[in-house]
Amino acid sequence: MAAPVVGDADLQSVRRIRLDVSGMSCAACASRVETKLNKIPGVRASVNFATRVATIDAVGMAADELCGVVEKAGYHAAPHTETTVLDKRTKDPDGAHARRLLRRLLVAAVLFVPLADLSTLFAIVPSARVPGWGYILTALAAPVVTWAAWPFHSVALRNARHRTTSMETLISVGIVAATAWSLSSVFGDQPPREGSGIWRAILNSDSIYLEVAAGVTVFVLAGRYFEARAKSKAGSALRALAELGAKNVAVLLPDGAELVIPASELKKRQRFVTRPGETIAADGVVVDGSAAIDMSAMTGEAKPVRAYPAASVVGGTVVMDGRLVIEATAVGADTQFAAMVRLVEQAQTQKARAQRLADHIAGVFVPVVFVIAGLAGAAWLVSGAGADRAFSVTLGVLVIACPCALGLATPTAMMVASGRGAQLGIFIKGYRALETIRSIDTVVFDKTGTLTVGQLAVSTVTMAGSGTSERDREEVLGLAAAVESASEHAMAAAIVAASPDPGPVNGFVAVAGCGVSGEVGGHHVEVGKPSWITRTTPCHDAALVSARLDGESRGETVVFVSVDGVVRAALTIADTLKDSAAAAVAALRSRGLRTILLTGDNRAAADAVAAQVGIDSAVADMLPEGKVDVIQRLREEGHTVAMVGDGINDGPALVGADLGLAIGRGTDVALGAADIILVRDDLNTVPQALDLARATMRTIRMNMIWAFGYNVAAIPIAAAGLLNPLIAGAAMAFSSFFVVSNSLRLRNFGAQ
């Protein structure tokens, strides 16, 4: 049934509500809850079986009302608690569930081994049946089919009360039917047994299915245990990320004293102290102190970053040395750290189109299986087979037809991929990215802040005449830096940064729009526009003239340095390319992708950057809206476009592309516009992110092919009487185990 669409007129009143749903045991349960919720007018719901979270867009309904709807469907629900920082006491629900299942599994397995051995012996060699053999088998089977299998029976009973079915219904009915038939055979009138042998035992187990009932319980418990453990491992990366948050923070009081409070109580604009080895509690600005900060947990970047006063810092990172006084600019759920955790959680609760199809199939699958099982048993009876043979076929169909693998195919892969991506600094916001990635053929780059560092630097120093020695170069740079150290111009900072130890300047003079001058070490030094420097003494030095023409043709800034009235050097100042730019572009081209540069710079500058990094083509003089037009034109030409931007002024282009990747620190614009957030300021994460998305889609497709193929092939085989119910139970458990194990391979993505 299609979910009611919330109209545009109602957008202002639409509330997004997330519920934690417990009691779901398979994809059919999730489909049932989703259907119940979507029957409510003005509600659009999506229920994820793997994460047990219902995401609901509702008009005019409160969370408790929606919880009531879920309760009426036979499950439990409570408003989802947004957690950004987990303390050590936080429990892992999947891990706890796995431990409970393990206790039942161990008891069941210990009893199943002698039960299977004795059952096989008594079936193959009837003469070995000692007096009371039926009681022995019953005593061994009873704890398994009752206590160990109780999780299945309890859900089946609840389903029966609500007139619904689920995977547990199939399992419980199979176990109960096999047990009842076996007890009837053991303690009822037994026909004389003709012949013996292993093949006869495998085909019908001598009409006694206690080992089948116990075996199905063991195999299904094992499958559920490994499934729960895999889901726990899949979420471990997210839990580890969340646990990085500071638990306590030392707030700096007005009198200089420090007060330690829980990090959750920190307020915006409060100042706090962070010492070596401590985690920064919130996003903020350094007010006092200097320290190296370990960003690896947040960005995957191994190299520490040095923070000085006025530098921005990110919560969740660790101070390695020094003491920092930080003023909080974002706290709690507003921090970048919290936003990244939410991104992973939201990605894990979304559904791909393939998963919606799988959930729909699972929702109707169980009733269909009962019909097929009944028809198969009836057909065998009509064909002249005995009741025990017909029952064996019916039981085999019920046991083998588990749709659990179908329901786990996509969510488990997404959970593992999003967790691994978080460890690498790659945050996939949802399935849109995964479903688009396989058809990407064009990657478009912004320049400033994406291919470049977004900060001016001296790129070349050209000396005049015979002054080509390194000593002459350092001397001129030092003189220029000394004069510029008194200036506040952006170009000045680049020149000062190029000289390690500029000297003092006297008589500093700044001429607006032209340059600066001053006395340094007894020399009169001028730094500025070539036209201003040569206003009285023309420069005819070929090297300097050539450097000026080359730099200006590339859209770079060229300044001359004059010492005592003689032009000594030309400094070319430009936005520096990132070290990773060329390698990242080469990696993309090696994957057969076309690369394009979009920039607001002039044609010469755009072509120069494109040539330096190996980009196929460049489009210059672009305003933000012009970038959107270019991307739209590429899409109209049949290309599938990925846009890589810094997320600040590239928001429209990131949204307009088929796939948006925001690289950098994850600004609000980036988080809202991009499909993939690359926290590390390293362009090599672009091909890595594309590879992760492709690997995830390959895993999902493999899981879906297996899950669909298994059910399509297994049911006819069981209906044909070619599978003993015990083997059917093992095959069903292996199906789910294969899916979760295949998904867990993504945990090793990118490991070198």
Curated annotation (Swiss-Prot):
It is found in: Cell membrane. SUPFAM superfamilies: Calcium ATPase, transduction domain A, Calcium ATPase, transmembrane domain M, HAD-like, HMA, heavy metal-associated domain. The active site is at D446. It is a multi-pass membrane protein. One of its GO terms (biological process) is copper ion homeostasis. The keyword Ribosomal protein does not apply. The chain crosses the membrane at residues 105-125, 132-152, 167-187, 201-221, 361-381, 390-410, 491-511, 714-734. A metal cation binds at C26, C29. This is Cation-transporting P-type ATPase B. It comes from Mycobacterium tuberculosis (strain CDC 1551 / Oshkosh). The lineage of its organism: Bacteria, Bacillati, Actinomycetota, Actinomycetes, Mycobacteriales. The gene is ctpB.
